[in-house]
Amino acid sequence: MCKISKARKIDETWEKLNKKYNIVKTINSIGYYKISADEIKEFQEPRLAVKFDHADDRPKLFMEHGLSILPITRGDYYISRIKAYHNFESISSDITYLTPPEHIKSLDVTSINSESKALNMAYISGILADFLEDENLLPTVSGRMSSESFAFYANVVGEAVTDEDSAVTVENSQIEIDAAYEGVKSLALMEAKRDLTDNFLIRQLYYPFRTWHQKMAKKPVRPVFLIYSNSIFYLYEYRFNDLQHYNSLELVKHKRYCLEDTHISVEDVQKILKKLRFNKEPKIQFPQANSFERVINICELLYINDVEKNFITEEYSFDVRQSSYYLDAARYLGLVEKSLDLDGHDCYTLTQLGKSLFSMSYKQRQLKLIETILSYKSFYLTYEAYRNNNEMPSKAEIVSYIRQAGVVDPKTGLPYSDSTNKRRASTVSAWVRWIINTINN
């Protein structure tokens, strides 16, 4: 069954709220607007109308005017041009390998399909103990709770605001902690996700941090973000250098962990090439989706639920165009198929090939993905050129490989224009780079 979302109802909701309450006009005048859950409820369930975990999730009105929204009580929200989101730092680190205890049979690496399971596995396998470097680590608080009362400043449109009159006051707002682990030296507050994303809502770390910083007296509180994707655990620890400044967070450290063998050699790929058979170009748009990690991630999300495109747009950090590009890229590779559900909505499901990936070990899955990519001639020719010259071919060379492969626009049956092929060449280069990095990891 396809999981359906209402086609950007969130956009309609906020257009109506703005029309009724002159939200943007008020913000332009005094810098903020306070709105209640009761006022929002006239047009949409408040919980759904204010949930923007990533910058791209915000409604059109917010995107156009640079707005963000934060809860300040159990039933009130603060809308302004606060810089509410933080971009994940682009850092690559060596993978640390650990092994779960042999006696654990109820959870294994092939069954991690939720944030809670990822957290449990990170705990029992020793990932958290290694990352936090604390003794006698034990799970403590989790779930929804009320915040303490506190005030903070935040950057607005790139400017640091410290004027006392500009402080935002929070009192008894609902917060949610995915998990907390307390050791001898500190308390770690965890925020966990299964979708790869460029940014996150600082509030998810800041509000729990402020609340538990007040409760813990002298014991340090450590905000930690955990992302689990494609068998890799990504951990980011942050600190707030100024307790009262929302945007003062700084990355303390970042590590990657895996519980499986991830070593893939050139010889492994050569074995693939010896038996490789080329696929015909499918009647689907040639990929324009540069992050192959996100192609994998969107397949992971579909493995949990068949979904409609707008659900991916709203539930995860994909905007509307990104959803189309990444779903089409997965369809191009034969990992995803599109059909109509009973209500006439486009529904996306994994193919048998797509489903089979997630019963494989990490190494088997990566090799199968490499084989799938290289079975399309433009990618194979680009990979071979890289292998022979030890450098990525130029964009012009990759365009020539796309033409050699006979790639055409499925809508017209004609070759893509040079400008379009140059954009597609970026994706070819990025995916081949992913293969090279996978081998070198």
Q: Where in the sequence are the language-model features?
A:
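Glycine-rich, often proline-containing surface loops adjacent to acidic residues and nearby aromatics
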Residues: 98-99, 176-192
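Phosphate/oxyanion-binding active-site loops and adjacent basic polyanion-contact surfaces
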Residues: 111-118, 168-175, 200-204
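Nuclease-adjacent, charged terminal/linker segments that flank catalytic cores
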Residues: 1-108, 112
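Active-site metal-binding core of divalent-cation-utilizing nuclease and nuclease-like domains
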Residues: 137-182
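Short, hydrophobic/π-rich interface segment
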Residues: 192-216, 392-409
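N-terminal, charge-rich interaction modules
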Residues: 82, 88-149
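Nucleic-acid nuclease catalytic cores
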Residues: 186-188, 193-200, 212-243
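Donor-sugar nucleotide-binding helix/loop cap in glycosyltransferases
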Residues: 247-441
